[in-house]
Amino acid sequence: MKHLGRHVLAEICGCDFDILNDIEKVEEIMVNAALEAGAEVRECVFHKFSPQGVSGVVVISESHLAIHTWPELGYAAVDVFTCGDKVNPWDACNYLSERFSAKHMTAREMKRGIIPETYLKEVANL
């Protein structure tokens, strides 16, 4: 069955505290991860928490990359959602794991936009 996109959810552990707590560094790494995967970056929004932690989103033409960091735990929760077949979300996740100096990453991929054929036929008739 066809799908519209791929959504990888990654648990990245054993990361460098200073990197995960640096908003500029996290944004730079996230943008470069999108580019590494072959995506076209549109916009970025990042926020620094007190006393530590960063959350952010990189909006790409093909969907998005999102991150929430817990530097005190060396942990980052990452989503990479891509539409089409030109961008590989796994390339972005592997890049992030490497650049965060992670000791471990687990990830799962979910196909998104699996629309039943009967519904597509209904929509086509509107």
Curated annotation (Swiss-Prot):
The active site is at 63 (schiff-base intermediate with substrate), 68 (proton acceptor), 83 (proton donor). It comes from Pelotomaculum thermopropionicum (strain DSM 13744 / JCM 10971 / SI). The gene is speH. Its cofactor is pyruvate. It catalyses: S-adenosyl-L-methionine + H(+) = S-adenosyl 3-(methylsulfanyl)propylamine + CO2. It holds the Pfam family AdoMet_dc. NCBIfam families: SAM_DCase_Bsu. Its EC number is 4.1.1.50. One of its GO terms (cellular component) is cytosol. GO terms for molecular function: adenosylmethionine decarboxylase activity. HAMAP family: AdoMetDC_1. The record marks 62-63 as: Cleavage (non-hydrolytic). Binds 1 pyruvoyl group covalently per subunit. It comes from the Bacteria. Keywords: Autocatalytic cleavage, Decarboxylase, Lyase, Polyamine biosynthesis, Pyruvate, S-adenosyl-L-methionine, Schiff base, Spermidine biosynthesis, Zymogen. The modification Pyruvic acid (Ser) is found at residue 63. Catalyzes the decarboxylation of S-adenosylmethionine to S-adenosylmethioninamine (dcAdoMet), the propylamine donor required for the synthesis of the polyamines spermine and spermidine from the diamine putrescine. Is synthesized initially as an inactive proenzyme. Formation of the active enzyme involves a self-maturation process in which the active site pyruvoyl group is generated from an internal serine residue via an autocatalytic post-translational modification. Two non-identical subunits are generated from the proenzyme in this reaction, and the pyruvate is formed at the N-terminus of the alpha chain, which is derived from the carboxyl end of the proenzyme. Belongs to the prokaryotic AdoMetDC family. Type 1 subfamily. GO terms for biological process: spermidine biosynthetic process. It is an enzyme of class 4 (lyase). Heterotetramer of two alpha and two beta chains arranged as a dimer of alpha/beta heterodimers. Pathway: Amine and polyamine biosynthesis; S-adenosylmethioninamine biosynthesis; S-adenosylmethioninamine from S-adenosyl-L-methionine: step 1/1. This is S-adenosylmethionine decarboxylase proenzyme.
